[in-house]
Amino acid sequence: MTSFPFYLDCDTGIDDALALAYLLASPQADVRGIGAVSGNVSAAVGARNTLDLLELAGHAHIPVALGAHDPLAGSFGGGAPWVHGANGIGEVELSMAAAGLAPETAAEMLVRLAQEHPGTLRVLAIGPLTNIAEALRLEPSLPQLVAEITIMGGAALAPGNLTPVAEANIANDPEAAALVLSADWNVTLVPLDVTMTNVLEENHRQELLASSGAVPRALGEMLGYYFRFYEGLFGRACSAMHDPLAAALAVGAVTPAVAPVVHVDVDTTSGPSRGQTVCDLRGLYMDYPEQPGARCRVVLALEGDFAPHLVETLLAYSSAAAASEPVGATVA
C-alpha cells in the first residue's frame, strides 16, 4: 500500500487526539511533522498534548512545532473547556513526554516539509487555519508544492456550532480561512454537514476502553468527557466525529457519497455571519455541474458507516506502545 508524507496541523483536543491516533495507525500516512495552533486550547497546551500522545503511542520521533497563539486578526478566545476539558483531552492525565518542541514555527515546518516533498506532501488541517495562512505568506508557491490539503471546517447547509451559521475552526480565524480557501490548490473541505451525521456511540467507546492498548484506552477515557457535552445536542451519550473523519478522508480510507467541487467564500465581516463558509451549492438540482475555476471539494455525505472503521483501526493499533500499560493515563 502506498504511503504519503503528511503534515498535520491541529489544536489538540479530544477529536484531534482521535485523528492523530488514526493517522499513526494508517498505513497510508507517514506523518513527518505536526504543528499546533490555538483553537480548542492554546497552541502551547495543544503542543504539549500532542507531544504526550506521541510518547504514549511510541512515536516520540515525530517533530512538533509551536504555531500561532492568536488569529491573524484579534486574539485567542480562550478555547472550549466545556467541550474538551480544561486540559483539552477530557481531564485525562498523560505522562509528560521527554521530547521538546521543534526549533521552528509550525508555518516554517510546513514550508520546509513541502520543499522536501514537492508534489507529494499531504496537509491535514483540523484546527483554525492560522498556521496554514502564515505558511502561505512565508512561501507564496506553497500551493504548487503541496499535493492536496484536507480541512475540517465550515458548514455548507448545516447550522454552525460556534454561531448559528459558523463552524468553530473557521470562525476562530476567518481571515486565515479566507486566505487558505482562496489559494490555488486542491482543497477537500470536511464540514459539519458530514461530521455531525457520523456519530460515535457509547458501545464504540466501551470497545476502546476494553482494549489492551494504551492509546485506545486513553482515547476511550477522553471520550467520556466529550460524550457528556454532545449529550446536550444528541440526547444520548455519543459524539460527532469531526477530526477523525477528516483524517480518514485525507488518507483515502473512506469514500464520499456527495462531494461537489464548488466555489467557497468565507465571511470576514464583523456582522452576525462572520466566519460563515458560503458554499455555492446552486447546482444541487442538476447534480452539481462543473464550476469553472472551483478547487474546493465539499464533502456533504459519506458512503457507509464510519464509526466501525474508526474503532477497528484504533483497536488494531500496531505501535510498540499499544500493548503497554498507560502510565498516568487516568481521569483526573
Model-identified regions with their sequence ranges:
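A residue-level signal for conserved active-site and pocket-lining positions in enzyme catalytic cores
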Residues: 64, 180, 247
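Generic secondary-structure signature for well-ordered alpha-helical cores
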Residues: 55-60, 69, 115, 119, ...
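Metal-dependent C-N hydrolase catalytic cores
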Residues: 4, 47-116, 293-305, 313-315, ...
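Active-site histidine-anchored catalytic micro-motif
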Residues: 2-10, 14-51, 92-197, 202
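Short, glycine/acidic-enriched capping/hinge loops at junctions between secondary-structure elements
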Residues: 18-20, 45-46, 75-76, 162, ...
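Short, surface-exposed amphipathic charged segments that create phosphate/polyanion-binding patches used
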Residues: 77-85, 163-167, 205-206
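Short, mixed-charge aromatic SLiMs
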Residues: 41-45, 72-73, 155-159, 264-282
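Conformational coupling and interaction surfaces
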Residues: 2-3, 22-23, 30, 171, ...
